A protein has these predicted regions:
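Loop-to-transmembrane alpha-helix initiation sites
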Residues: 140, 156-164, 174-186
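RNase H-like, Mg2+-dependent phosphodiesterase core
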Residues: 143, 152-161, 186-188, 193-200, ...
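C-terminal ends of transmembrane helices
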Residues: 39-44, 109-119, 146-153, 194-199
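Interfacial segments of multi-pass membrane proteins
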Residues: 65-68, 91-95, 109, 124-153, ...
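Cytosolic, membrane-interface loops and tails of multi-pass inner-membrane proteins
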Residues: 40-73, 197-213
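Short, non-helical or kinked segments that cap or interrupt transmembrane helices
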Residues: 49-61, 115-128, 155-161
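Helix-coil boundary and interhelical linker segments in multi-pass alpha-helical membrane proteins
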Residues: 8-26, 82, 86-102, 132-138, ...
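Alpha-helical transmembrane segments in multi-pass membrane proteins
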Residues: 26, 30, 35, 39, ...
Length: 213
């Protein structure tokens, strides 16, 4: 019996297309949400200049704080975290189980936004928003590690690295294997984005939290 081409079964093509539609939509929505450069937009609207020419050049909340505008930094932190959370929630609304995929896409979007020639932030706040929706206890532990580290050492970058390392450990301890895999990926990307900070920490040249430029 001769097998018929798939093209002769339009119903099968439609079903296959529909199976791909939800994951693809989650990826696109996640990336586009993540790529919104709130820090850059807020500093420009607030008259604080081009964030990319300030401090580390990052578009995240820590660099916004270096402008001396604490309100803008807080708003950036909330919005960057919020877009990560929103990506997960929207993806779960499209199809349950797609949240982690959309969250990862949002994280990549923040770090590599197409609008800024793929030169974005370091993703810590966005990652926290993602984790908050997927597992608030893990998010609470990571935030606590970050806060404790910053209070003790006064380096946001060091706190971010320690928080990124603690998140997958906490998830694994809670038996959340799939979440652990996602958090390992996020942690590796966060370390990669902080490679300049790591070098400055090694040389003793990393600016401390709250230092204005």
């Amino acid at each position: 019996m001769t097998a018929k081409p798939v093209a002769q079964f339009p119903g099968a093509i439609i079903v296959i297309s529909m199976l791909w539609l939800a994951p693809l939509s989650a990826l696109i929505i996640g990336y586009l949400l993540g790529s919104i450069p709130f820090g850059l937009v807020l500093t420009r609207l607030g008259g604080a200049g081009d964030l990319r020419a300030i401090g580390s050049g990052s578009i995240g909340a820590t660099n916004v704080l270096r402008t001396g505008r604490k309100g803008l930094a807080a708003a950036t932190l909330l919005l960057d975290g919020g877009k990560g959370a929103a990506a997960v929630l929207l993806a779960e609304a499209i199809q349950p189980g797609l949240g982690p995929m959309a969250g990862l896409a949002a994280f990549v979007g923040h770090c590599y936004p197409v609008w800024l020639r793929f030169n974005g932030g370091k993703g810590v706040a966005t990652a926290l928003g993602i984790i908050l929706v997927l597992s608030w206890p893990v998010a609470l532990i990571a935030a606590g590690v970050w806060l404790a580290s910053v209070v003790v050492f006064r380096f946001s970058s060091l706190g971010s690295l320690m928080a990124a390392a603690s998140a997958p450990v906490a998830a694994l301890a809670m038996g959340k294997i799939e979440l652990t895999v996602l958090l390992i990926a996020l942690a590796l990307l966060i370390v990669w984005k902080h490679r300049g900070n790591i070098e400055r920490l090694r040389r003793g040249a990393e600016p401390r939290v709250g230092k204005s430029v």
